[in-house]
């Protein structure tokens, strides 16, 4: 492991909670952004059927 020396600078009891906490915050922010900036994700999460926006005409 080439990043093993990081624990000589930061204790694992401090570094691991910071790392896992920052990952959890980023995951929350990404999910919040997807839910607030799309119209179909919230409906999908609530079990609604997908609506077809346009129909394809047969040739």
From Swiss-Prot:
Residues 1-11 are cytoplasmic. A bacteriochlorophyll binds at residue 31. GO terms for molecular function: bacteriochlorophyll binding; electron transporter, transferring electrons within the cyclic electron transport pathway of photosynthesis activity; metal ion binding. The core complex is formed by different alpha and beta chains, binding bacteriochlorophyll molecules, and arranged most probably in tetrameric structures disposed around the reaction center. The non-pigmented gamma chains may constitute additional components. It is found in: Cell inner membrane. Belongs to the antenna complex alpha subunit family. GO terms for cellular component: organelle inner membrane; plasma membrane; plasma membrane light-harvesting complex. The chain crosses the membrane at residues 12-35. InterPro entries: Antenna_a/b (IPR000066), Antenna_alpha (IPR018332), Antenna_alpha_CS (IPR002361), Light-harvesting_complex (IPR035889). Gene3D superfamilies: Light-harvesting complex. Residues 36-59 are periplasmic. This is Light-harvesting protein B-800-850 alpha chain D. Antenna complexes are light-harvesting systems, which transfer the excitation energy to the reaction centers. One of its GO terms (biological process) is photosynthesis, light reaction. Its main location: membrane. It comes from Rhodopseudomonas palustris (strain ATCC BAA-98 / CGA009). Pfam families: LHC. It is a single-pass type II membrane protein. Keywords: Antenna complex, Bacteriochlorophyll, Cell inner membrane, Cell membrane, Chlorophyll, Chromophore, Light-harvesting polypeptide, Magnesium, Membrane, Metal-binding, Transmembrane, Transmembrane helix.
